[in-house]
């Protein structure tokens, strides 16, 4: 017996070089990244945002510091701080905003993604 599993199709690979600003990296996010990079004492670091399978809605966001930039990475600079996104992740993030928020419940990086059809209550998982 053969079982077929249907996976959601990814949006077409974007030509992000033709877009003026494929996603928004806010001043608040850049300021927090700068602070964290200074704590690491490594000026070569950039914040990498990526999408991976998982979470309760199918996909989840990931953040990490990275010294390495691939040739096909999108590199956005805000106030001297670099945000890196690989092409596969970018197709799910076009038009999104990467921000940093502080509230009584805590502080965190957030992604406001217009491509997400549903999001998890935690805010780190979504579906397309």
Curated annotation (Swiss-Prot):
Write down how the cofactor binds this protein.
Binds 1 iron-sulfur cluster per subunit.
Does this entry carry the keyword Iron-sulfur?
yes
**GO molecular function annotations of the record:** 2 iron, 2 sulfur cluster binding; 4 iron, 4 sulfur cluster binding; iron ion binding
SUPFAM superfamilies hit by this protein: HesB-like domain
Q: Which UniProt keywords apply?
A: Iron, Iron-sulfur, Metal-binding
Q: What is this protein called?
A: Iron-sulfur cluster insertion protein ErpA
| Function (record text) | Required for insertion of 4Fe-4S clusters for at least IspG.
InterPro entries given in the database record: FeS_biogenesis, FeS_cluster_insertion, FeS_cluster_insertion_CS, FeS_cluster_insertion_RrpA, HesB-like_dom_sf
Pfam families (alphabetical): Fe-S_biosyn (PF01521)
Q: How does it assemble?
A: Homodimer.
Instruction: Please report which protein family the annotation says this sequence is part of.
Output: Belongs to the HesB/IscA family.
Organism annotation: Xylella fastidiosa (strain Temecula1 / ATCC 700964)
């Amino acid at each position: 017996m053969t079982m077929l599993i249907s996976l959601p199709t990814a949006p077409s690979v974007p030509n992000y070089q033709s877009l003026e600003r494929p996603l928004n990296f806010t001043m608040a996010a850049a300021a927090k990244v700068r602070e964290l990079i200074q704590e690491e004492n490594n000026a070569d670091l950039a914040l990498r945002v990526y999408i991976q399978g998982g979470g309760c809605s199918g996909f989840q966001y990931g953040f990490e510091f990275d010294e390495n930039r691939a040739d096909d990475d999108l590199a956005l600079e805000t106030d001297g701080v670099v945000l890196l996104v690989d092409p596969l992740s970018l197709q799910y993030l076009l038009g999104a905003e990467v921000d940093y928020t502080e509230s009584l419940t805590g502080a965190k990086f957030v992604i406001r993604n217009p491509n997400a059809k549903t999001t998890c209550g935690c805010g780190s998982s979504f579906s397309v």
